[in-house]
Amino acid sequence: MTKSIIREIGPLALNFQDDKVLIFFGDNAPSELREYSIIHDVEVFNQNDFSAGAKLVIGKYVYEIEAVGGEAANNMSKLGHLVVYFTEVPDEILPGAVYAAPHIFPIVSNGEEVLITL
């Protein structure tokens, strides 16, 4: 299981609702990206969780991971960085991306858990 807690929601982090994208970063997010990011504390990390078929839970929203870019687990491990797309999986998967279904943009709040588990 991979588990994190949402600590801060950048003032522009939810501006990607129409694109159905959430950007997560650890507390070390670069200042130029922090306002666009959801800052979270990764409490537990398991690289094996980052695979198609895993479950992603954000607060009360439950998703199935449909595809994972080759760098997503590494980015999460080192930077707490994860980009989640609630869209169809494209032909070319972005290296740091996770694609989740259903394609519904979640409402997120400070203090909520983010879980990824097989």
Residues covered by each model-derived region:
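Helix-rich interaction surfaces within compact, conserved domain-sized segments
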Residues: F24-F25, E88-L118
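Short, conserved secondary-structure segments in the cores of folded domains
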Residues: N46, A52, A72, P102-I104
